């Protein structure tokens, strides 16, 4: 009886592992965070479906370890009508990414990262109490809060525009991210950032 021949594969010729593409389409490894202060807080861990089952919610500030796309999805759920509807929010972001790629021919994750960098305020105001009088004081914004504020402004823009427009939420989100990535002051999120910084500048 002839023995089956088994050829050992050379160590250097190992089969390459397939990358985890977001929504089986977008390569996260192509994206670079250009703002040095945000590198630590914009998480780009490759995932197919951005869903962590709440494992980052048990410890304070642990959300910095959550993929940035999932943080946007979670923020879109924080309305009275969309609470808990993660499948709906994932669908909105997935469709928005398709539209961004169709309009710009770019990786939509890269557009999202640029939009966050352009919409996160670098300074804001706090209220200090002196002898019973509240006095506004300008302070630098922490990098994690910059990311939080940016995602919040983008999500807020989608909520407000969806009430006034017949366009689907995915199209509104796509337009907002494209405009924010270019730093367009006419878009809601960039306008909110500039308003925060203008108030902080007057309180220096």
Swiss-Prot record:
Organism of origin: Methanoregula boonei (strain DSM 21154 / JCM 14090 / 6A8)
Protein name, as recorded: Small ribosomal subunit protein uS7
InterPro entries membership: Ribosomal_uS7, Ribosomal_uS7_arc, Ribosomal_uS7_CS, Ribosomal_uS7_dom, Ribosomal_uS7_dom_sf, Ribosomal_uS7_euk/arc
Any one GO molecular-function label of the UniProt entry: structural constituent of ribosome
Alphabetized CDD domains for the sequence: uS7_Eukaryote
Database matches in PROSITE patterns: RIBOSOMAL_S7
Job description of the protein: One of the primary rRNA binding proteins, it binds directly to 16S rRNA where it nucleates assembly of the head domain of the 30S subunit. Is located at the subunit interface close to the decoding center.
Family label: Belongs to the universal ribosomal protein uS7 family.
Keywords per UniProt: Ribonucleoprotein, Ribosomal protein, RNA-binding, rRNA-binding
Superkingdom of the source species: Archaea
GO cellular component terms, A-Z: small ribosomal subunit
GO annotation terms (biological process): translation
Residues of the signal peptide: none
Summary of subunit composition and partner proteins: Part of the 30S ribosomal subunit.
NCBIfam families attached to this UniProt entry: PRK04027.1, uS7_euk_arch
């Amino acid at each position: 009886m002839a023995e089956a021949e088994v050829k050992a594969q050379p160590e250097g010729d190992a089969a390459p592992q397939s990358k985890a593409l977001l929504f089986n389409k977008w390569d996260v490894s192509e994206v670079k965070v250009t703002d040095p202060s945000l590198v630590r807080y914009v998480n780009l861990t490759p995932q197919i479906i951005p869903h962590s089952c709440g494992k980052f919610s048990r410890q304070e500030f642990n959300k910095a370890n959550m993929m940035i796309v999932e943080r946007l999805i979670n923020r879109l759920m924080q309305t009275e009508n969309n609470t808990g509807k993660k499948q709906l929010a994932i669908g909105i972001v997935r469709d928005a990414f398709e539209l961004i790629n169709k309009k710009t021919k770019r990786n939509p994750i890269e557009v999202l990262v640029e939009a966050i960098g352009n919409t996160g305020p670098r300074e804001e105001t706090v209220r200090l109490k002196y002898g019973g009088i509240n006095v506004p004081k300008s302070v630098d914004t922490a990098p994690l809060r910059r990311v939080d504020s940016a995602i919040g402004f983008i999500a807020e823009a989608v909520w407000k525009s969806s009430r006034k427009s017949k366009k689907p939420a995915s199209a509104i989100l796509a337009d907002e991210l494209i405009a924010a990535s270019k730093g367009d002051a006419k878009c809601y999120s960039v306008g909110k950032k500039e308003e925060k910084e203008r108030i902080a500048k007057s309180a220096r």
